[in-house]
Curated annotation (Swiss-Prot):
Protein name per Swiss-Prot or TrEMBL: 5'-nucleotidase SurE
Family matches, as Gene3D superfamilies: Survival protein SurE-like phosphatase/nucleotidase (3.40.1210.10)
InterPro entries: SurE, SurE-like_Pase/nucleotidase, SurE-like_sf
Pfam families for the chain: SurE
Chief location of this protein within or outside the cell: cytoplasm
Organism of provenance: Anaplasma marginale (strain St. Maries)
Taxonomy of the source species: Bacteria, Pseudomonadati, Pseudomonadota, Alphaproteobacteria, Rickettsiales
Free-text remark on how the cofactor is bound: Binds 1 divalent metal cation per subunit.
Length: 261
């Protein structure tokens, strides 16, 4: 099998190095196409009508000056151009969980979704971190990902119920692993409200007058009251697997309006 690795934290991120180690020896060919810089929370953005500079690091590695979705699509196109379409795309391993309200913003999940959109089975993997996010992943232990990820990927590849029919998002806890659970993401019922990311505001005086600088810091999702949700199960120490599909329709509201027609 041929696998393409991508992410949103950047080509040289620690999570990508861990993912390379994890998949090494399990696939006939490993290709990498990832952003040149950290593109966290880039969601599904594509660089439309903009040249995307891409550096080649060997025949199977591409550093993309674009978004995570750009990186996934470019990687697939490069493989296809040599007659080697990927059998699987793995996006990650992200530094930080992608559960609940963070799912639509996640560049990690978006890169996997871009692959899924063009017919390639895709898995997104995220590693929960312990405490406040900091540079160089100092507070994150990747041990659980190293131990668990490849076994889960192999399990999904054998599973005829999945068979690439959606993006599979895997979240790995930083605490001792209690097992594996399948769950929906915790904003599905619409009852949980998010205050947005934590933000730092700075006033700046520059040559063109007074400006304000904003820094979005932490994208963690609020806790859900649903003990079976992805956010709660991850906090309880479970590896959480969430199937993510195309539809963004609120069918309950749609049915009410359709009933008035």
């Amino acid at each position: 099998m041929r696998v393409l690795l991508t992410n949103d934290d950047g080509f040289d991120s620690v999570g990508m190095r861990v993912l390379r180690d994890v998949v090494s020896g399990h696939f006939a060919e490993v290709w990498v196409s990832a952003p040149a810089r950290d593109c966290s929370a880039a969601s599904r953005a594509l660089s439309v009508r903009t040249p995307i500079k891409t550096h080649m690091r060997g025949e199977r590695e591409f550093v993309v000056h674009g978004t995570p979705a750009d990186s996934a699509v470019i990687g697939i196109c490069e493989m296809t151009s040599t007659g080697k379409r990927p059998d699987l795309v793995i996006s990650g391993i992200n530094y930080g969980a992608n559960t609940g309200f963070t799912v639509p913003y996640s560049g990690t999940i978006a890169a996997a979704a871009a692959a899924f959109d063009i017919g390639v089975p895709a898995i997104a993997i995220s590693q929960q971190y312990n405490g406040k996010r900091c540079d160089n992943n100092v507070e994150t232990s990747w041990q659980n990902s190293r131990k668990s990820v490849m076994a889960l990927v192999s399990r999904l590849l054998r599973d005829t119920m999945w068979h690439g029919k959606c993006v599979m998002s895997i979240n790995v806890p930083y605490s001792d692993v209690q097992g594996v659970k399948f769950a929906g993401h915790s904003c599905d019922d619409g009852h949980i409200k998010w205050d947005g990311p934590s933000m730092e505001r700075r006033e700046i005086t520059s040559g063109d007058g007074r400006c304000v600088s904003y820094v979005f810091d932490d994208m963690r999702s609020p806790n859900s009251n649903d003990n079976a949700s992805d956010t709660q199960l991850l906090e309880q120490g479970y590896i959480v697997v969430t199937p993510i599909g195309h539809s963004m329709t609120d069918h309950a509201i749609l049915d009410k309006y359709c009933g008035l027609q």
